[in-house]
C-alpha cells in the first residue's frame, strides 16, 4: 500500500470514529485531520471536502466482495443450509458495522446526497439474493414465486432481528442468535419448498 493510500485510509478511519462519537455536525475537518495525524490541507488534497470523506466512509461500510465471497464459497444448493449461511453471514456483517448503521438512522438520513450511496449495499444484497433464488427456482428447488419479493422478505426478516437487537438488546427478545437463525430459516424454507 502506498503512502498516499495509507493516508487516505487513516483519514477515513478517523472520520468514521469521529462520526460515531460526535455525529456529522460535530465532526469537523480539523478534528478528522488531527485524529488522522495529518493537516487539513492534506485532507482536502485527498478528498476535497467533508462530504466526499463521508461518501467514501459510506462506500467502505456496505455489502461488498468480502461478504459476497464468503457466502459464494459456502453455497451447496441445499436451501436450508444455504439460507442459514447467508443469514448468519448477513447478521455477522451487520454486527461488524452496527455503529455505522445506527449512525445512519441517527444522522445520515438528513443528508439527501448520501441516500444513493447508502442504498447501494442493500440493493446489491437484494440482487445477489434474487439471483440465488432464481437459480433455486430454475433447479425446481423452490416454488414458482417472485424472487425479488422473496429476497426482500428474507432481508427484512433478518434486518428486523438485527435492528431489534442493536437498538433494544434483549428487551424485545432474549432469543439467542442461533435459535433465531435456525427457526426463521426453517420457517422460510417450509414456506417456499415445493
Where are these regions (language model features)?
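Basic, helix-initiating cap at the start of DNA-binding domains
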Residues: 1-22, 27-38, 52
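C-terminal alpha-helix
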Residues: 18, 132, 187-194
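Helical hydrophobic small-molecule/effector-binding pocket
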Residues: 58-59, 81-106, 155-159
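Short hydrophobic/aromatic patch on the recognition helix
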Residues: 38-47
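Conserved hydrophobic residue
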Residues: 24-25, 114, 142
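Amphipathic alpha-helical packing segments from all-alpha helical-bundle domains
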Residues: 92-96, 113-139, 149-152, 163, ...
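Short helix-capping/turn signature of helix-turn-helix
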Residues: 47, 105-111
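Amphipathic alpha-helical linker/stalk segments
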Residues: 55-86, 133-134
Amino acid at each position: 500500500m502506498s503512502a498516499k493510500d495509507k493516508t487516505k485510509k487513516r483519514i477515513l478511519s478517523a472520520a468514521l470514529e469521529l462520526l460515531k462519537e460526535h455525529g456529522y455536525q460535530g465532526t469537523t475537518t480539523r478534528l478528522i485531520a488531527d485524529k488522522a495525524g495529518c493537516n487539513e490541507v492534506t485532507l482536502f488534497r485527498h478528498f476535497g471536502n467533508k462530504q466526499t470523506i463521508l461518501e467514501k466512509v459510506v462506500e467502505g461500510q456496505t455489502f461488498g466482495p468480502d461478504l459476497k465471497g464468503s457466502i459464494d464459497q459456502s453455497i451447496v444448493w441445499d436451501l436450508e443450509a444455504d439460507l442459514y449461511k447467508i443469514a448468519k453471514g448477513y447478521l455477522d456483517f451487520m454486527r461488524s458495522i452496527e455503529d455505522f448503521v445506527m449512525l445512519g438512522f441517527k444522522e445520515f438520513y438528513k443528508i439527501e446526497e448520501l441516500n444513493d450511496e447508502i442504498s447501494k449495499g442493500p440493493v446489491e444484497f437484494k440482487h445477489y439474493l434474487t439471483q440465488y433464488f432464481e437459480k433455486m427456482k430454475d433447479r425446481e428447488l423452490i416454488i414458482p414465486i417472485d424472487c425479488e419479493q422473496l429476497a426482500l422478505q428474507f432481508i427484512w426478516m433478518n434486518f428486523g432481528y438485527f435492528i431489534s437487537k442493536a437498538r433494544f438488546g434483549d428487551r424485545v427478545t432474549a432469543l439467542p442468535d442461533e435459535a433465531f437463525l435456525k427457526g426463521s430459516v426453517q420457517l422460510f424454507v417450509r414456506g417456499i419448498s415445493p
